[in-house]
Amino acid sequence: MIRRVLLLSLALLLAGCANEALFRPKPALESAADAPFSVSGRLSANLDGKGHVANFDWRHLPPRDEVAINSPLGNTVAKVLRDPGGVTLLADGKRWQADDVESLTRQVMGWPLPLSNLVWWIRGLPAPGVESRVDADGNLEQQGWHIRFIRDADVDSDHPKRVEMQREGLTVKVVVQSWQ
């Protein structure tokens, strides 16, 4: 009986791995920055063993971004608003402001959300104008971040299904559930 359970578990594990493949970064196109999009999904962050998980809805309407951070039940618990004038974070009836998302989220949440680069990375593109390197496995190194792109193996898509970012004890994972 135990052997059957182990074999079934192994088969399910292998089947789950078979549905993913690496998504290789493409050269960044300047025109892509101006392409609006709406994306929903899940976000997880783990900083030195402490984890946070949330759902998100992100509207990118250049030069503005609006990211709603939602609880697992769908309630909006925070909003990040970015425009040329800076960034505002609204949560718990409070308002924080800064010049950029990275410093604001580091100050309030304890870890930086690289939104200015994530505009590119979520599409499987390196951010333009910034030095980057792609290794043999298709992983991107840019601005101190190690980025891994993963796609559904059975779906031909112009963007990755999952983006995993690591830097200085911090791992941020973004899983795309819908893209428009």
Curated annotation (Swiss-Prot):
So what does this one do? Answer: Plays a critical role in the incorporation of lipoproteins in the outer membrane after they are released by the LolA protein.
Q: Which domain of life is it from?
A: Bacteria
- Membrane topology classification: Lipid-anchor
Sites of S-diacylglycerol cysteine lipidation: C17
Q: From the Swiss-Prot or TrEMBL record, give the protein name.
A: Outer-membrane lipoprotein LolB
State a GO cellular component annotated for this protein.
Answer: cell outer membrane
Biological source species: Chromobacterium violaceum (strain ATCC 12472 / DSM 30191 / JCM 1249 / CCUG 213 / NBRC 12614 / NCIMB 9131 / NCTC 9757 / MK)
Which Gene3D superfamilies does this UniProt record tie to the protein? Lipoprotein localisation LolA/LolB/LppX (2.50.20.10)
Sites of N-palmitoyl cysteine lipid attachment are C17
Q: Which UniProt keywords apply?
A: Cell outer membrane, Chaperone, Lipoprotein, Membrane, Palmitate, Protein transport, Signal, Transport
Family according to the record: Belongs to the LolB family.
Which gene is transcribed and translated to give this protein? Answer: lolB
